Amino acid sequence: MESVLNNEKAIVVFSGGQDSTTCLFYAKKHFKEVELVTFNYGQRHDTEIEVAKQIAQDQGMKHHVLDMSLLSQLTPNALTQHDMEITNNEDGIPNTFVPARNLLFLSFAGALAYQIGAKHIITGVCETDFSGYPDCRDSFIKSMNVTLSLAMDKDCVIHTPLMWLNKAETWKLSDELEVLDYIRTKTLTCYNGIIGDGCGECPACHLRQRGLNQYLESKGAL
């Protein structure tokens, strides 16, 4: 399987965060040619786009940044509204959820993949540390894979290497890819826009740090 993939082209849905950067290095290992696509949808911090650009430049990779600012016009949410406090809604879904975001992102990634001749799309969604986002579920990804292939009349494969990994296992994968320190210091996960270990207070920082501590404990490095 790996020898086949090594001769093919892939595109990574890339935000500059821990998960998508792990997917970047996963893709570099498994595919002959890799390009990145980042979506500018009016994130809380412009820093996210700049971090993605910097990592792409560091790795010498072709990087597409697409304007998706219309998302912030469709629904108020804590990812795009700077003055909105991050909370859980009554149904348990965080108010950082942007309805249909991954549906749109994968559609545009698929269109770009078609144009550049890439059969494979890699995204860092996962169910294990699932925040309640319905468009991170494996069932949605499988459905989207079929939909994209039918819509473009061309085989398309969506890869989700982190789907069944918790955060500790994601750190383990980055260590196996020999990029744990790079991901720890260069990526942006923090909702408050602080690179690396982040603010230590927001839900994203708590999840990331807890996973790192669990992994380092498991290998006796803490």
Curated annotation (Swiss-Prot):
GO molecular function, one term: zinc ion binding
One Gene Ontology biological process: queuosine biosynthetic process
Family annotation (CDD domains): QueC-like
Co-factor remark: Binds 1 zinc ion per subunit.
Keyword Ligase: yes
Pfam families, sorted: QueC
InterPro entries assigned to the protein according to its UniProt record, in alphabetical order: QueC, Rossmann-like_a/b/a_fold
Pathway the protein acts in: Purine metabolism; 7-cyano-7-deazaguanine biosynthesis
Binding site for Zn(2+): 190, 199, 202, 205
Binding site for ATP: 14-24
EC number(s) on file: 6.3.4.20
Organism domain of life: Bacteria
Segments passing through the bilayer: none
Keywords on record: ATP-binding, Ligase, Metal-binding, Nucleotide-binding, Queuosine biosynthesis, Zinc
Cofactor(s) required for function per UniProt: Zn(2+)
Catalytic reaction list: 7-carboxy-7-deazaguanine + NH4(+) + ATP = 7-cyano-7-deazaguanine + ADP + phosphate + H2O + H(+)
Described purpose of this protein according to its UniProt entry: Catalyzes the ATP-dependent conversion of 7-carboxy-7-deazaguanine (CDG) to 7-cyano-7-deazaguanine (preQ(0)).
Assembly with partners or alone: Homodimer.
Similarity comment: family membership: Belongs to the QueC family.
Protein name stated in the entry: 7-cyano-7-deazaguanine synthase
Organism: Staphylococcus aureus (strain bovine RF122 / ET3-1)
